[in-house]
Amino acid sequence: IALSGIYDARYFNHHQDYGNDEVVYQNSPADYIWNQHDGWFIDKYRQADIIVCTGLGDWEQDGLDSFYNLKRAFEEKNIPAWFDTWGTDVAHDWVWWRKQMPFFLHSIGL
């Protein structure tokens, strides 16, 4: 379960490339998934319960581009995942995460 994230490491470097830094690349899901061609890894993702959620309210705008880019990557690779957008009143804040986490845990039976 990923809540209100930024999934492209370039955001933290003013949208510049991260060069040859493999650690940064592997922690940039929007890039890593697009470039993943190993069927074994893709199958592992397909077997997982993946939920990615964002709000559309205050302080969420910085992560929206990478949210939608990651969603497109999952769709392209046929990796099932629940990409959920909450309303414009839903901010990047603990108040909302405390509501979202129990909601999603309950939704997957935990």
Question: What are the language-model segments listed below?
Answer:
Residues I1-L110:
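Non-catalytic cap/lid and distal C-terminal segments of serine-dependent acyl enzymes
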